[in-house]
């Protein structure tokens, strides 16, 4: 975790501008993820002639690589400082574009082309975990740990913005110049971000002996479990809301997803200081309550407007869960371990979103689509109870010896 430089208090606008000047590098990394997202499955299946399994695998490889590399990203951010980790991650994003470019140039050799695509996706996953984790810690180093919740919130906003922009733009670039043109755009985005990041001042890494991974996991896993349980609500809406609307015979599933995204981003923009004012655990419990109401409304909806209100509430409720619990999780370890803590905490959300789809699919095939929203509400209720117990637990003293050694 970087050592923040002591400075006079910043007003809200200047504070946000400083944060955005750093998290824009995460925006760039997620833009390189969003640009090919709507293109590659169709390219692998329809153009290259491979099965739907391979089309899905090409996309999934990035998420597996992100999941496996995220703990290493946090550890190296603590050891080397976040700026180096961000630049390393952006280089991975650049190399992923190079992989797509060479895959397009070797289209006459389908197996080679597919392997190059897969390699590019793996490199992108590693790059994203390093750029995402590093940009959060870099932002905290610039504005101070008091504002870690705001930094995490802004990182989420730029993530959603980049993904929302990237997918349609990627389709436009692909229709304009094929996979090679799309690859060059991705390489250009990453290269511009690298050139902007390199001249920026470096934030010093914290001194001190780092805790082993097992010790970090032991301090953050309960917060991670609450996050994982709450993420099930997001997972079932993002994955199955279209099937839910089809089962009901309604139109407007895409608009429901738009409502979720607007509520998610809007809540983060409307309540930037909520975590600092009333505490991360209090914010999390309020968010869980709102998310539960939203999921229950979707599950029992008999009219489209009920489902839309439910999705809106679920998006607003889930919005601040990650930063609210993340602030408390990161502060549960010494400063020199906070990068590893943030990365480890994030893994719980990655795992949750990975297993929610297939598990909810099994429940849906057995009991129907609406039941998965009621089940997700039950999981969020467990997260609420867990967070309430964490709030009642006496605070754990963080040993200073480790941070001053």
Curated annotation (Swiss-Prot):
Family named by the database record: Belongs to the major facilitator superfamily. YhhS family.
Matches recorded under Pfam families: MFS_1 (PF07690)
PANTHER family per the UniProt record, alphabetical: MAJOR FACILITATOR SUPERFAMILY MFS_1 (PTHR23517:SF13), RESISTANCE PROTEIN MDTM, PUTATIVE-RELATED-RELATED (PTHR23517)
Membrane-topology annotation of the record: Multi-pass membrane protein
Organism: Escherichia coli O6:H1 (strain CFT073 / ATCC 700928 / UPEC)
Sample GO molecular function, one term: transmembrane transporter activity
Protein name per the record: Uncharacterized MFS-type transporter YhhS
Gene Ontology CC: one annotated term: plasma membrane
Keyword field: Cell inner membrane, Cell membrane, Membrane, Transmembrane, Transmembrane helix, Transport
Localization per record: Cell inner membrane
Membrane-crossing residue ranges in chain numbering: 19-39, 47-67, 85-105, 107-127, 156-176, 178-198, 224-244, 252-272, 283-303, 309-329, 344-364, 366-386
Keyword Membrane attributed: yes
Keyword Ligase: no
């Amino acid at each position: 975790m970087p050592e923040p430089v002591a400075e006079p208090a910043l007003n809200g606008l200047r504070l946000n501008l400083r944060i955005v000047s750093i998290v824009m590098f995460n925006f760039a990394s997620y833009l390189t993820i969003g640009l090919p997202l709507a293109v590659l499955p169709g390219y692998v299946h329809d153009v290259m002639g491979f099965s739907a399994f391979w089309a899905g695998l090409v996309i999934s490889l990035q998420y597996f690589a992100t999941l496996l590399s995220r703990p290493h990203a946090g550890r190296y951010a603590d050891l080397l400082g976040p700026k180096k980790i961000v630049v390393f991650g952006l280089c991975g994003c650049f190399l992923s574009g190079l992989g797509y470019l060479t895959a397009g140039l070797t289209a006459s050799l389908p197996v080679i082309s597919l392997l190059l695509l897969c390699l590019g996706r793996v490199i992108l996953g590693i790059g994203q975990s390093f750029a995402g984790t590093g940009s959060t810690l870099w932002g905290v180093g610039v504005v101070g740990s008091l504002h870690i919740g705001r930094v995490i919130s802004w990182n989420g906003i730029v993530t959603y913005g980049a993904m929302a922009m990237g997918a349609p733009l990627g389709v436009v670039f692909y229709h304009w110049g094929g996979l090679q043109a799309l690859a060059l755009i991705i390489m250009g985005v990453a290269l511009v971000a690298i050139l902007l990041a390199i001249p920026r001042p470096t934030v010093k890494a914290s001194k001190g002996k780092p805790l082993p991974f097992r010790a970090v996991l032991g301090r953050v896993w309960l917060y991670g479990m609450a996050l994982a349980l709450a993420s099930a609500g997001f997972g079932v809406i993002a994955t199955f809301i279209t099937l839910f609307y089809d089962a009901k015979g309604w139109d407007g599933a895409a608009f429901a997803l738009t409502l979720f995204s607007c509520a998610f981003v809007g809540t983060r923009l409307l309540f930037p200081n909520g975590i600092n004012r009333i505490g991360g655990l209090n914010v999390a419990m309020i968010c869980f309550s709102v998310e539960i109401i939203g999921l229950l409304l979707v599950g029992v909806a008999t009219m489209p407007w009920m489902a839309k209100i439910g999705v809106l509430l679920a998006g607003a409720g889930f919005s601040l869960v990650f930063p609210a619990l993340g602030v408390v999780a990161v502060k549960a370890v010494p400063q020199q371990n906070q990068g590893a803590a943030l990365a480890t905490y994030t893994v719980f959300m990655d795992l949750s979103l990975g297993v929610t789809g297939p598990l909810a699919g099994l429940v849906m095939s057995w009991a129907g689509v609406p039941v998965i929203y009621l089940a997700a509400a039950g999981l969020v209720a467990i997260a609420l109870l867990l967070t309430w117990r964490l709030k009642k637990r006496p605070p754990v003293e963080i040993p200073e010896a480790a941070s001053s050694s």
